[in-house]
Amino acid sequence: MSRQIIFGPPGTGKTTHLLRIVEKELRENKVSPNKIAYLAFTNQAADEALSRAISQLNYSTKDFMNFRTLHSLAYRELHLKEENIMSDEDYRVVSDKLQINLSNPNKNTETYGAGFPDDVFMKVIDGAKVRGLTTENFFHDPTVGHLEGGWLKLKYIDTALSQYKTERNKFDLTDLIVEFNKKHYDTVPHFDVVIIDEAQDLSWLQWKMVERIIENSKRVYVAGDDDQAIYRWAGARPEYLINMEGQNEELYRNV
C-alpha cells in the first residue's frame, strides 16, 4: 500500500489537487470510479468534491458512490435505515422520562462533522466516545468542568440513554462510527484508492475508522492542514495527520 500525506493550507487549491488525483487514477490507472473513496469530515467538503468531480470528469453521482462523509459511509455499511437514527422525538422521550432536557447532537454532526450538544451532559457522553474513553474517565478530565449532580447524575443519564438505544436499535451519528469500528476486517469495504480530506479535524474515533479503511486499500492520500485544526476542543487529533507515515507533499499558494 502506498500512502501520501498532503498538507494544504487555505488558498493552495487542495480540493483541485485532490480531484486531479482522482482524474489520474481514472484515466491513467484505469480505476473504476466506484473503487475510489473520497471521504471528508464535513458534508460541505464531500458535497463540493462530488459536485466538482461530476462536472469536471463527466461522471454521474451514482459513479462516485463513495464520495461522502465518514458518518455517511458508516451508515451505509451498517445497513441502517432512517428510523434507526436518534431523532429529536427520541431525545424528547428520553428527556421526559428522566425529567432532564437532552439535546440532539446529530444535527451539528451532519453539518460540521462533529457533535456540539447544547447541554453539558450530552457533551460529556459524546465527548467520551470520540476520544475513546469511558464516560466516567472523561468526566474526570480537567476540561469537563463542573456538572450539576456530578458523576451519579451523568451515569444515570448515560445508562438510561444507552438502554433506550439498545431496546429500539437506535444510534446517534457518533455511534455509527463506533459500530463501524467493530466490523470484522473482511466486512470493511475494499477500495483501490482512498482520499481523506480535512484530516486535521478527525477525532480519535474517526482516525480509528480511517485506519480500518486504509488497511484494505491500495493507494491512500490523506490531506489536511494542521494549522487549521479548529476542533481540538471537540476531540480533533491533528497530531495523527502530522505523525502519519508516508510520502509528504506540501501545497503552496500561487503568487
Question: Positions of the model-derived regions?
Answer:
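Short, polar/flexible loop-turn hinges at active-site or ligand-entry regions and domain interfaces
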Residues: 31-35, 56-64, 80-93, 102-109, ...
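Short, well-ordered alpha-helices that flank and scaffold nucleotide-derived cofactor binding pockets
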Residues: 20-28, 51-55, 178-185, 208-215
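Conserved helicase motor core of SF1/SF2 NTP-dependent helicases
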Residues: 9-12, 20, 41-43, 200-255
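P-loop NTPase Walker
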Residues: 1-83
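Short, surface-exposed alpha-helical segments at coil->helix boundaries
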Residues: 47-50, 174, 238
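SF2 helicase/translocase NTPase motor core
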Residues: 54, 61-64, 69, 88-97, ...
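Accessory N-terminal region flanking or inserted into the helicase ATPase core
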Residues: 1-8, 16-17, 35, 106-195, ...
